[in-house]
């Protein structure tokens, strides 16, 4: 039996967006636990660390002046001002992962996804996760037991706004069963990894196959 063939490929910038409570965080965690070829993009932020958060693991914590300078220098693939704090995706570590054939997972909203697509185009795959109903979304938010009625109402209003941008994504999934939705997300990732334009070693491999046949009539 011949040895298996491994072709070099370019990584995927995999965006997973959803309203709060629709399952994005759970699915992201499952992806990172099960697939060692994908890494979570660590954002920079000006907000202070929360208890248990580690600099460089959960976020890169920077002051406002540092963040502004990074933005002015083009050091971010995307950034936004959200609830009084700035958040951004550092460019250099993402480009290093891509070049090494690693995939990068982004937990960002529709605005971040739009900016990222404008910057990185063909490398970006955008997936939006919808709840089965708004009633189910509210039930999930209340089941957390962490938010007041006022906060939940604000989250529901924000969710409606986020859902209105569903058509800016390449794939849209309905999460009525988290295991099935996770399977669909992974099917998308596997298919995107196999796209011809990402198989950077494919041209040379095909050329070698053809040249191994004497007198082959080929344009290669």
UniProtKB/Swiss-Prot annotation:
Q: Per the UniProt record, which EC number(s) apply here?
A: 2.7.4.8
- Record field: catalytic activity: GMP + ATP = GDP + ADP
Coiled coil feature spans? none
User: Single GO molecular-function term?
Assistant: guanylate kinase activity
Guanylate kinase-like domain: which residues? 11-190
Matches recorded under InterPro entries: GK/Ca_channel_bsu, Guanylate_kin-like_dom, Guanylate_kinase, Guanylate_kinase_CS, P-loop_NTPase
An example Gene Ontology CC term for this record: cytosol
Pfam families in UniProt: Guanylate_kin
Spell out the subcellular localization from the entry.
Answer: Cytoplasm
Which PANTHER family does the record cross-reference, listed alphabetically? Answer: GUANYLATE KINASE, GUANYLATE KINASE-RELATED
Q: What is this protein called?
A: Guanylate kinase
What is the source species?
Answer: Sphingopyxis alaskensis (strain DSM 13593 / LMG 18877 / RB2256) (Sphingomonas alaskensis)
* Organism phylogeny: Bacteria, Pseudomonadati, Pseudomonadota, Alphaproteobacteria, Sphingomonadales
Gene name, per UniProt, is: gmk
């Amino acid at each position: 039996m011949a040895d298996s063939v491994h072709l070099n490929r370019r990584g995927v910038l995999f965006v997973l967006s959803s309203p709060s409570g629709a399952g994005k965080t759970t699915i992201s965690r499952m992806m990172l636990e099960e697939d060692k070829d994908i890494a979570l993009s660590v954002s920079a932020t000006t907000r202070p660390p929360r208890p248990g958060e580690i600099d460089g693991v959960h976020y890169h914590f920077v002051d406002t002046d540092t963040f502004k300078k990074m933005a002015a220098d083009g050091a971010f693939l995307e950034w936004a001002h959200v609830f009084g704090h700035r958040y951004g995706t550092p460019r250099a570590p993402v480009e290093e992962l891509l070049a090494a054939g690693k995939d990068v997972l982004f937990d960002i909203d529709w605005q971040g996804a739009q900016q990222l697509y404008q910057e990185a185009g063909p490398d970006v795959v955008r997936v939006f996760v919808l709840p089965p109903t708004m009633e189910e979304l509210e039930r999930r938010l209340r089941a957390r037991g962490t938010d007041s009625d006022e906060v939940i109402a604000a989250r529901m209003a924000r969710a409606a706004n986020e859902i209105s941008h569903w058509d800016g994504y390449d794939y849209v999934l309905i999460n009525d069963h988290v295991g099935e939705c996770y399977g669909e997300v992974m099917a998308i990732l596997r298919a995107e990894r196999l796209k011809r334009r990402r198989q950077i070693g494919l041209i040379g491999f095909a050329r070698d196959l053809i040249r191994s046949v004497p007198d082959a009539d080929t344009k290669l």
